[in-house]
């Protein structure tokens, strides 16, 4: 997911920001590993290296898939307003508590299926989807602001590719970034 974060926040921007990784405590299972860790609910957390180097500050961002809140806390330091949705109530509560303890005051967490996003706060300058959809949900594309960027894994369980989508000129420009492997996006609760 670090490459996802970088693709979202640093797409085409020369200025880079390096985060001190120690500011956001990693989940214990991730401590010396450069791979995703499984949460108690059976979901996965982003690999720790994913969010380290990112670029320009965005105003309003939607994260689909809060998980433990680790990546959310990193993103919160890089954006003005962060809205994040999680479909599993135990994970949402755990993340909300963690974010409160870390002093992340610019984050709102909601229990919701990821495929519908959070239209009440749209449009978003950036949308980061942390689970794979066979096709990008139209509801998420509709919530992207003009000039905004959405990064998501797209494909079936066997093969997925990380895509960056930019909204411009009344349409969308799609870019394939790399092959990835993510848990499936659940479109409804």
Feature locations, PLM:
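Conserved nucleotide-cofactor-binding alpha/beta core module
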Residues: 50-168
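Low-complexity intrinsically disordered segments
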Residues: 2, 23, 34-36, 81
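Short linear motifs in low-complexity or flexible loops
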Residues: 7, 18, 25-32, 37-39, ...
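Conserved Class I S-adenosyl-L-methionine-dependent methyltransferase catalytic core
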Residues: 1, 41-47, 52
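Glycine-rich phosphate-binding loops of nucleotide-dependent enzymes
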Residues: 11
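Active-site capping/gating segments
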Residues: 155-189
């Amino acid at each position: 997911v670090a490459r996802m974060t970088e693709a979202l926040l640093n797409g085409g921007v020369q200025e880079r920001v390096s985060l001190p990784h120690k500011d956001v405590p990693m989940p214990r299972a991730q401590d010396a590993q450069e791979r995703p860790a499984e949460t108690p609910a059976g979901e996965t957390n982003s690999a720790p290296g994913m969010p380290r180097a990112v670029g320009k500050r965005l105003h309003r961002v939607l994260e689909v898939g809060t998980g433990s809140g680790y990546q959310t806390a990193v993103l919160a330091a890089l954006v003005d307003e962060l809205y994040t949705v999680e479909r599993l109530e135990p994970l949402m509560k755990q993340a909300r508590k963690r974010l409160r303890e870390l002093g992340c005051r610019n984050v709102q967490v909601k229990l919701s299926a990821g495929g519908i996003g959070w239209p009440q706060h749209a449009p978003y300058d950036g949308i980061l989807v942390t689970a794979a959809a066979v096709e990008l949900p139209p509801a998420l594309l509709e919530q992207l602001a003009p000039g905004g960027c959405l990064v998501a894994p797209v494909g079936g369980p066997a093969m997925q590719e990380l895509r960056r989508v930019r909204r411009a000129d009344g349409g969308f420009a799609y870019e394939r970034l790399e092959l990835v492997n993510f848990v499936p996006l659940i479109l409804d609760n």
